[in-house]
Amino acid sequence: MARKEFRYRGYTLEQLMNMSLEELAKLLPARQRRSLKRGLTPEQKKLLRKIRLAKKGKYNKPIRTHCRDMIVLPEMVGLTIYVHNGKEFVPVEIKPEMIGHYLGEFAPTRKRVQHGAPGIGATRSSMFVAVK
């Protein structure tokens, strides 16, 4: 079975690529729409500049950013962006399905807790076990 072509709110990826930020903002959910309406921060503009250079092939270093509040735009699709999670840069490969989400959603800041075995005295039954 053939893979279904990606569409965002009825528009293909090519149509989304040709839209301006204002036209794209009308398709996004309210929180992202308001964020784009206020304008991009200087950090977001710098990241967008790097992304546009990388698409042209003029920026060959990995794109690293602390800008977790950047909205994934259609022009980012296909790139790998390293997003900081507070400790390290996590590689995030941008797919069409990510359009409209924030970069920070794909780089979790907290690890899942992996508890070890309980120690002596941790439970009622182990209180009276002799400690060698």
UniProtKB/Swiss-Prot annotation:
Molecular function per GO: rRNA binding; structural constituent of ribosome
SUPFAM superfamilies with a match to the protein in the record: Ribosomal protein S19
Recorded GO CC terms: cytosolic small ribosomal subunit
Pfam families, per database record: Ribosomal_S19 (PF00203)
4Fe-4S among keywords: no
Highest taxon of the lineage: Archaea
Keywords on record: Ribonucleoprotein, Ribosomal protein, RNA-binding, rRNA-binding
Function per UniProt: Protein S19 forms a complex with S13 that binds strongly to the 16S ribosomal RNA.
Record-stated family: Belongs to the universal ribosomal protein uS19 family.
Protein name as catalogued: Small ribosomal subunit protein uS19
Native species: Pyrococcus abyssi (strain GE5 / Orsay)
